[in-house]
């Protein structure tokens, strides 16, 4: 009984002491509205997240437009940078997470996922180039008797590109067929003086305006040469047939209209004219040149249809950005130069090479024309 009383006294004392301590402590003040507001830094990051997410969404929507709507002013230019908007979307997602902008994060996730779906085939080859093709183009000199060839396309920018560098690239890369765009008479003479005919003695050059032209150079004869295979409203697109290990392959040097103010509709028209080549089943084609369009442009994909294939995409090489090369501080961001192969062909060993004097880079590809 005495023990119980003592314990009760101790508990009562502790209770009084706890109550006294509680009274002596200052009561917690509620947060003010200012304290509940996000930090200025977070607000700025949230603003950037929203802006970047909306830009990515806008660019993604433009890429999804049908071909007829992609000829609207400035839409082709926006679409040419589509892969870069995927990167912008990832930045938007990171900023949205940091600033807790849920809607911006969801928009960024959707846009990045869709862009990733569009772009991943560039990094995965379903039809890899056979080892025999790799071996064939590895010799010191080009072997023109097999079904494999190293080909090259390059826009020489109004004939201003360095002719000597072109010849050296042809030599070093063992190029068998070369397509050039925007040539001039003076440039062609410089090319000859630099020794192009030592490696590619056969050529077919044509011009629709008498000033700038397009051309083909080959290590073997160009059979059935024509000035304009496509009947294009943009420029003459010369062609010639090359024998590759018993396979007759028709090469075309392509240059479509650039998507610039005043020429939006003409840009699409020049690509539509190329699309008519799908019905020319009497030849097997390889188109090389400046298409002024990336794979993200619907008119370019319509030209490919179910018959033709972009070499960079089927090779799994990744992006082949080739323009512009003459803007200080600005990287090449658009893959508008292409090698397009016919069904049954495979391609690989894609390479982009900068050559002085042009606003484009050269694109080199190894092709295997054996029917697969």
Regions found by a protein language model. Give the residues of each.
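N-terminal targeting leaders characterized by basic, low-complexity, disordered sequences
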Residues: 1-40, 44-47, 51
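Alpha-helical transmembrane segments
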Residues: 41-52, 78-81, 103-110
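Membrane-embedded alpha-helical segments of integral membrane proteins
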Residues: 48-96
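Membrane-helix interface segments
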Residues: 71, 101-104
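Structural signal for the C-terminal ends of transmembrane alpha-helices
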Residues: 94-102, 371
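N-terminal signal-anchor transmembrane helix
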Residues: 98, 106-172, 189
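Soluble catalytic domains of enzymes that build or remodel membrane lipids, polysaccharides, and related
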Residues: 151, 157-171, 180-372
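Internal catalytic or translocation cores that form aromatic/hydrophobic pockets or channels
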Residues: 175
